[in-house]
Amino acid sequence: MFEINPVKNRIQDLSDRTAVLRGYLDYDAKKERLEEVNAELEQPDVWNEPERAQALGKERSTLEEIVTTIDQLEQGLEDVSGLLELAVEADDEETFNETIAELEVLDGKLGQLEFRRMFSGEYDRANCYLDLQAGSGGTEAQDWASMLLRMYLRWAESRGFKTEIIEESDGDVAGLKSATVKIIGEYAFGWLRTETGVHRLVRKSPFDSGGRRHTSFSSAFVYPEVDDDIDIEINPADLRIDVYRASGAGGQHVNKTESAVRITHIPTNIVTQCQNDRSQHKNKDQAMKQLKAKLYEFEMQKKNADKQVLEDNKSDIGWGSQIRSYVLDDSRIKDLRTGVETRNTQAVLDGDLDKFIEASLKAGL
């Protein structure tokens, strides 16, 4: 006798996921549009306008990929349910194993479509920068910023991404006032883009001799690395460039030469800084590259009203734009947008973020 309940549960899970995608991808509208495009492409005079015909061909290919895959999934799930019934009625192990093999194929197809849905943005495949900024709260908030840095570095390592710390500004007693990390690898921005927002920590502070509960905030801001050939006009007169001595980990040159560079774009108040090289010139080039990326993201967010508007004033880190709450006393971390939560707080702080990230991506945030 076979264990059929796990197989039935898996069929139901795949059916539910397919239904979610069907709605999110607006299957009915796409199928209708595909019929219209096919009808246009069948017209004998369609190639009188080659550019129009090519655009229609490209649109058809995109629509077919979605419509055909969902059709195959729905038909496949119906077939596999029938196959399972046959296997049980005939007590046929070979047919039962065939059912499981077919489910694997369907799961793979569905996973590819879910992946496509999650990473459909123009820059999702790009490397990215992650800016971390401690909020008000002094040493406790600065320690929280350093905990977040460690968490994201661990997560990136577990995903096979390379990381490069571009800038670190040490806290007054412990932790960090700010840090910028470059995360290098395919789909780095796609994976991390929904992590932009305020992260709230509640714990008994190790810096409070009375062991009282403290609430601290730190912000994360993720933006893609843009291609050098992207045309972003930057007027040199709009820039304030400061040089200073590097602080934090960085080798023997730290605090000996003014190699660190901070660039402020005065019209937008966007700031970038770099201190990870001995050469002031190289640090300036990197800071300019970050500025270009930030300005590009700023312009994109201005054009797209459905995206979260870039906050010019990073000092306003508080309750308003929270995305996740880390309550360590109660062993509870909860994403305030998706409702996903876990009690394994240490695993999350050690970089186990996938359940939160995947939920936010699947929700289309």
From Swiss-Prot:
Cite the Gene3D superfamilies for this sequence. 3.30.160.20, 3.30.70.1660, Release factor (1.20.58.410)
Q: For this protein, what is any one GO molecular function term? A: translation release factor activity, codon specific
Asked if the Swiss-Prot or TrEMBL record annotates the protein with the keyword Hydrolase, the reply is no
- Key words, A-Z: Cytoplasm, Methylation, Protein biosynthesis
Pfam hit, one: RF-1
InterPro entries, alphabetically?
A: PCRF (IPR005139), Pep_chain_release_fac_I (IPR000352), Pep_chain_release_fac_I_sf (IPR045853), PrfB (IPR004374)
Q: Which domain of life is it from?
A: Bacteria
Keyword Endoplasmic reticulum annotated? no
User: N5-methylglutamine occurs at which residues?
Assistant: Q252
Provide the record's note on post-translational modification.
Methylated by PrmC. Methylation increases the termination efficiency of RF2.
Cysteine pairs forming cystine bridges in this chain are: none
What is one term from the GO cellular component aspect held by the record? cytoplasm
Compartment list: Cytoplasm
Q: Name one GO biological process term.
A: viral translational frameshifting
Query: Per the similarity annotation, which family is this?
Result: Belongs to the prokaryotic/mitochondrial release factor family.
Which HAMAP family does this UniProt record tie to the protein? Answer: Rel_fac_2
Q: What does this protein do?
A: Peptide chain release factor 2 directs the termination of translation in response to the peptide chain termination codons UGA and UAA.
An additional note in the Swiss-Prot or TrEMBL entry is: The gene for this protein contains a UGA in-frame termination codon after Leu-25; a naturally occurring frameshift enables complete translation of RF-2. This provides a mechanism for the protein to regulate its own production.
Q: What protein name applies here?
A: Peptide chain release factor 2
Q: Which gene encodes it?
A: prfB
